[in-house]
């Protein structure tokens, strides 16, 4: 690197509980500290999202972009694309993360044809690969942007226009080749326009069949070229589509099983997407892990007062603790998963160094959540709580139900003469208020040490 883009920022270190007024530093994330049998960096595998960090201009539906970035003076599109790579790898080094994620169109400008676009992209990938050799920086996942360009107005794999499907397949082919070049550990499919605006003019069955064919083609080509990445589908219920086909984890799992994709694909789950679907982040992770389909996580949060996808940096300790408890229960985020910060500063946080503060709060939030989740797991607090709640299935009629020896006739004989008073007396109170109070206590106590 010839220029220092992020001036005034040194490499960010773990400072523990020093006064945060001392500047940039991690209070809870100590990357090489071993907790729960693994280094924190291996539990969390943090990644920086190229699009939000280096391309995002902080626009919103009511105003122009406010972002001030150290490469804004560069006007030539290819010169700017190459300069962003320098700025990005300086950022990764100073932040101390091990992974990055990107869309193909984050990196280089499009040409008039796909051939020209691929040529531009390859020049940037050459530079990224050189930096990888120098730094050891890895790619958690890459993906293809098939939602921004007007050609994808009605979707890519689900477009009613066969030419658009063909173009999307050709674009994805090159994206998979790039994934192999950079050693991406996963490949993500997020279909923002793979859905519909109105059912009146939509053949929903046909569109979903086309999407499944597209995913099978992608996996087949990855196998053909030796690109051994975990394939991931990312659910989202809406926006920009009125209704997106991969609405949430459960819907996407059903789709995967319907079209025989569940052997090769897992899920990449995002906090804000979970909220838009009417779920907690923990719910979505639980659904995926219990189906053995948890692949990776996008770390961000929504705003309860705002009904759209705002991709805010995560700062909710309670939600992060719940998410990391599911990860601890799973043993890892996924076979090759990590925590990618699909997050951006607020429009009013436009200074370049706000990008560091945003990532620091996100990193510390999930590191804190991991510490609390491991402490709860170590104490067996939730395991005992759940075991006690379902203890009636350990003996008597409950054991018969579990063993599969009970049927409606035997259960009728057991229940038909039981008085209501006996049933009510056998029902235990769920002390949810006590549970939440205890979780608050774990958060406060664990993070105070």
From Swiss-Prot:
Main location: cytoplasm
Cofactor dependency: Mg(2+)
EC number: 5.3.1.5
Keywords (A to Z) from UniProt: Carbohydrate metabolism, Cytoplasm, Isomerase, Magnesium, Metal-binding, Xylose metabolism
One GO CC term, this protein: cytoplasm
InterPro entries recorded: Xyl_isomerase-like_sf (IPR036237), Xyl_isomerase-like_TIM-brl (IPR013022), Xylose_isom_bac (IPR013452), Xylose_isomerase (IPR001998)
Cytoplasm listed as a keyword: yes
GO BP annotations listed: D-xylose metabolic process
Catalytic reaction(s) noted: alpha-D-xylose = alpha-D-xylulofuranose
UniProt-recorded Gene Ontology molecular function terms: magnesium ion binding; xylose isomerase activity
Family in the record: Belongs to the xylose isomerase family.
Subunit structure, as described in the record: Homotetramer.
Role this protein plays: Involved in D-xylose catabolism.
PANTHER family noted in UniProt: PTHR48408, XYLOSE ISOMERASE
HAMAP family (UniProt xref): Xylose_isom_A
Protein name per its UniProtKB record: Xylose isomerase
Protein's organism: Lactiplantibacillus pentosus (Lactobacillus pentosus)
